[in-house]
Amino acid sequence: MTPNPSENKLKSGPSEESSGSGDDQQATGSGEEYDDEEIDVSLDDFDSVNSYLDSLNSALDAIEQRNDDLKEQLLNLLQSNREIRQSMQEENAKRSADGGGPSEPAPEAASEDAMEH
């Protein structure tokens, strides 16, 4: 059963705004206006809302855990990409410093060219 907030407002006692005194006893109501059946229904509604909030809390915890796992994976991927980029830049800088021109083909590529001719 899904709790209906409008029903809870109807069942609640006089509000602090309407009492104007701010006295806690008047704001919450004395309970004399309600019979036992309405109080039991209110407790059942409270238990229902409490159960619903517990299930929402569990779902949010699971989502938060997945979010944390994804964040960790993304940070690892980012770090890996930074390392790869840095090594490629160092390799390109080394090639430029050594030859100044286009790099020589890899030995495997050179042997394949020789086999074709």
From Swiss-Prot:
* Entry superkingdom: Eukaryota
| Keyword Flavoprotein assigned | no
Region feature (Disordered): 1-39, 83-117
Q: What does the similarity note say?
A: Belongs to the UPF0184 (EST00098) family.
Q: Give start-end ranges for the coiled-coil region(s).
A: 50-92
Question: What keywords would UniProt list here?
Answer: Coiled coil
Which InterPro entries does this one have? BBLN_eukaryota
Lineage here is: Eukaryota, Metazoa, Ecdysozoa, Arthropoda, Hexapoda
User: Biased composition, Low complexity: where in the chain?
Assistant: 12-22
Flavoprotein among keywords: no
Q: What is this protein called?
A: UPF0184 protein AAEL002161
> From which organism does this entry originate?
Aedes aegypti
